[in-house]
Design a protein with these regions (language model features):
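Intrinsic disorder at enzyme termini
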Residues: 487-575
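Helix-rich, typically C-terminal accessory recognition domains appended to large enzymatic cores
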Residues: 365-401, 410-512, 635
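Short, glycine-/Ser/Thr-/acidic-enriched flexible segments
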Residues: 13-14, 150-152, 179, 234, ...
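Phosphate-backbone binding interfaces of nucleic-acid-interacting proteins
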Residues: 547-678
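Beta-strand segments within the central parallel beta-sheet cores of soluble alpha/beta enzyme folds
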Residues: 308-311, 491-493, 600
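N-terminal, positively charged nucleic-acid-binding surface of large information/translation enzymes
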Residues: 1-203
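Structured secondary-structure scaffolds
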Residues: 1-48, 100-104, 172-391, 430-434
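A non-catalytic, amphipathic alpha-helix used as a structural packing/dimerization or gating element
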Residues: 32, 70-81, 107, 215, ...
Length: 678
């Protein structure tokens, strides 16, 4: 099959605000899709840019005593750093305040003018006498003229969805100075869409999903209204050719920025190439600009329209809109100062299903899903298998037996199903399938009990570990669009330099395994709590770009926990010396019936025999078998404790909080049953 040629864009982030975790829903999922396409061997170019024009930029720069150019340069630097640290990889990230965009905007405008689509109308407009400027839609608030909802912007109502002119608002006020504006007449340019009524009505169903097209087509029951494309000076943007003191409305040149970024990347010819697919990823709040005005502008100027517009919903946190007061309006930088980017990328993948439904981020579920699935289920295979192979078997993979080969083949066979989910942007289903493979691999591992067989049959153990690690390798390949850095580390483990989608069909046998490298960490709820508190405290969470960069020095490493439990009473060293800490190999681990906390753990303690310990750590191990084969540290000389469920013969050391983060203290592959731990 011939490789596809694809151009992909995400909506342009505005240069007057921080990137926050709501924005990242779009950029992260676009990055998933682009990386997948590249792994499939397709030529896929991902372009984006900062949206830099408009009154907010001008006013913000004026307040700070700097030029708009200085403001947008600073903002772009921060945006690029945030995207980079979240492992979002653009082929070109540009700016709309560019010579390419100016040239293309004028070209597209003149084409519409020549076709007679541009008209002039004198219209009433709100003017603030204190600020000495006509007020853009977003700089005036008042009562919705349709439903009576208060505190609505001058272009549309959040309550009823109606659109209107700012002069129609009841009790309007300037959002900059809170003064009541006056009405003044001003001549403006309008882009008439009605001449393209038939074209757009046919275009929309073929290039959007049914839920989006059904909404848009409601507007076609009547003649399409003209679209005001000009703004009065003072304004930061491109002046309209032949129109003194009139500037292109930001939504005219913003989408043209896609083409300008492509041109800046040296790939301008791809846009109109009939063999190239064009895809936009956008939020549902900007549908009308991308699915009505934008294809109309492109069509009038002889440019190809997008192949498909992919629309997603908004992000809610703990079931509510993001809130500054609750600390859930979190900037990308505040997140990175407290938590690793891989965790959010994985969680978003597990939740995104390619629909316009809003996506929920539940912070407790976030911790649990990352710890249980990514760390405890998937990474656990590499951790247990890789470290045992390196420490006990010289790091050499062997050959697989029939059972192991069947497991690996199952993983290979799942490849096209997972690929289809990626293609359809059903990333949640891709994650489900990968987790099913992880379940099968863990079941195989636990059934073969390599922690036991290593004592009596090293080659049998090598066969088991070879199959388990090959299964993990395939899963890591399937995860690469979601977790690129994680996958690169896994790739080095197997001594490889490049993975594409077809790499999953190969197996690694009778070869050396590289050094095991840390892949993923468990999330501590305290890290999440620290992030929430930081979000409450930082003024940058208002959505404005702060004066100073808040770049993390540790690039997303977990932050130090601000608070901890108070120290208990002081003890002497002699007290500590009384403890006899030993290593025990977990022979079996099972849930204690009718208990929500207890696990029954049987330890092989070497010459000391076996110990049964009841431990309240069930919350950290949703699947008790995860502990089997682990070498854990326990207090061996603790007096036996009679409990209602039996006699507990020791205490297992635990670090963290059961059910949230942490686990039994392990030293796998270092010691053996009965060894003293010092």
């Amino acid at each position: 099959m011939q490789n596809r040629k694809i151009v992909v864009t995400s909506a342009l982030p505005y240069a007057n605000g921080d990137i926050h975790i709501g924005h990242l829903v779009e950029y992260i999922q676009t990055d998933f899709w682009v990386r997948f396409q590249k792994m499939r061997g397709n030529e896929c170019v991902y372009v984006c840019a900062d949206d830099t024009h408009g009154t907010p930029i001008m006013i913000r720069a004026r307040k700070e005593g700097i030029t708009p150019e200085e403001l947008i340069a600073r903002s772009r630097e921060q945006h690029v750093k945030d995207f980079t640290d979240f492992q979002i990889k653009f082929d070109n990230y540009y700016t709309t305040n560019s010579p390419e965009n100016k040239e293309l905007s004028e070209q597209i405008y003149k084409a519409a003018e020549e076709k007679g689509y541009i008209t002039r109308k004198t219209t009433p407009q709100l003017y603030c006498e204190k600020c000495k400027m006509f007020l853009p839609d977003r700089f005036v608030k008042g009562i919705c003229p349709k439903c009576g909802a208060p505190d609505q912007y001058g272009d549309s109502c959040d309550k009823c969805g109606a659109t209107y002119g700012a002069e129609e608002l009841g009790s309007p006020k300037c959002t900059t100075c809170n003064e009541k504006p006056v009405v003044k007449d001003s001549e403006h340019l309008y882009y008439e869409l009605e001449p393209q009524h038939e074209y757009l009505e046919k275009w929309i169903p073929d290039h959007t999903t049914s839920d989006v097209s059904n909404k848009l087509l409601e507007w076609f029951k009547e003649p399409l209204r003209g679209w005001c494309i000009s703004r009065d000076a003072p304004y930061f943007g491109f002046e309209i050719p032949g129109c003194k003191d009139k500037y292109f409305y930001v939504w005219v040149d913003a989408p043209i920025g896609y083409i300008a970024s492509l041109k800046n990347a040296g790939k301008f010819e791809m846009w109109n190439d009939p063999n190239v697919e064009l895809y936009h990823f956008i939020g549902k709040d900007i549908i009308r600009f991308h699915c009505l005005f934008w294809p109309g502008m492109l069509n009038a100027a002889g440019f190809k329209g997008p192949t498909k517009v992919f629309v997603h919903g908004f992000l809610t946190v703990n079931g509510e809109k993001m809130s500054k007061s609750k600390g859930t309006f979190v900037s990308a930088r505040t997140y990175l100062d407290n938590l690793p980017p891989e965790a959010l990328r994985y969680y978003y993948a597990a939740k995104l299903g390619g629909t316009t439904d809003d996506m929920g981020l539940n912070l407790s579920d976030f911790v649990q899903r990352v710890n249980s699935d990514l760390v405890g289920k998937i990474t656990n295979i590499a951790s247990r298998g890789g470290q045992m192979l390196q420490k006990k078997l010289g790091g050499m993979l062997g050959a697989m037996d029939d059972e192991g080969r069947a497991l690996v083949q199952k993983c290979i066979d799942a490849g096209e199903t997972i690929a289809k989910h990626y293609e359809d942007r059903k990333f949640n289903q891709a994650v489900v399938e990968i987790c099913r493979l992880a379940d099968a691999a863990n079941e195989y591992f636990d059934k073969r009990e390599p922690w036991k067989t290593i004592k009596v049959d090293e080659e049998a153990t090598r066969i088991t570990l070879t199959a388990a690690l090959n299964a993990f390798r395939i899963m890591a390949i399937y995860l690469k669009p979601i977790l690129p850095v994680y996958a690169d580390k896994a790739m080095k483990l197997f001594g490889e330099t490049q993975w594409d989608w077809a790499s999953a069909c190969a197996v690694r046998e009778n070869c050396a395994l590289g050094e095991y490298e840390y892949l993923a960490s468990r999330i501590d709820i305290k890290q999440v709590e620290a992030m929430v508190e930081a979000a409450k405290a930082k003024p940058g969470e208002t959505g404005e770009v702060s004066h100073e960069s808040r770049a993390s020095k540790n690039k997303g490493a977990p932050a130090q926990v601000a608070e901890c439990a108070p120290l208990k009473g002081e003890i002497q060293f002699a007290d500590f010396e009384k403890l006899d800490l030993r290593v025990g190999v977990v022979e079996s681990c099972e849930v204690v019936p009718k208990s929500s906390k207890l696990l029954k753990i049987v330890l092989d303690v070497g010459a000391l025999g076996k110990r049964t310990i009841f431990s309240g750590i069930r919350g950290a191990y949703p699947k008790p078998e995860m502990l089997v084969g682990k070498e854990v540290v326990f207090v061996a000389n603790l007096a036996p404790r009679k409990m209602s469920v039996g006699v507990s013969e020791g205490m297992i050391l635990f670090a963290g909080e059961p059910g949230v983060n942490g686990g039994a203290v392990t030293i796998d592959g270092v010691a053996g049953g009965g060894t003293q731990a010092t």
